[in-house]
Amino acid sequence: MKKIINTPESFVYDMCHGIAAAHPELEFVEQYKVVKKREINEDKVTLISGGGSGHEPAHAGFVGKGMLDAAVCGDVFASPSQVQVYNAIKRTKSNKGTLLIVKNYSGDCMNFNNAA
């Protein structure tokens, strides 16, 4: 399969900026590689997931109305750090709590658990 990538070093940032540009209701927090809704409904449980990049549009492709409130993007085939996950939790907090959707990958399990 062929993919169009400007440079491997900027791939994740390019992808996240593109998703945010195509969907004005979303924003990209570049420092932590988090794609999130601009407006968070604080009267519902917020949903966050994430994982390694390279299988786009997962996970950022699931951010939107009726789906995730934020996605944390790791580097290509690498889990996001606990600092990235923690900042996603802080930026999407609600009065009803936050549910982290974690897949069964050891790096994701460890970093999402430590961030919580």
Show which residues each predicted segment covers.
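Structural motif
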Residues: 26, 44-48, 75, 96-100
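Conserved active-site and cofactor/substrate-binding residues in soluble primary-metabolism enzymes
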Residues: 6-14, 42, 54, 58, ...
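Glycine-rich phosphate/diphosphate-binding loops that line cofactor/substrate pockets in enzymes
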Residues: 34-42, 87-96
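N-terminal amphipathic/basic leader segments beginning at the initiator methionine
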Residues: 1-47
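Glycine-rich, flexible N-terminal cofactor/catalytic loop recognition
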Residues: 34-65, 72
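Glycine-rich oxoanion-binding loops at beta->alpha junctions
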Residues: 55, 62-95
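N-terminal glycine-/lysine-enriched basic segments
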Residues: 96-116
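Fold-independent oxyanion-binding glycine-rich loops
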Residues: 23, 50-53, 70-71, 102-105
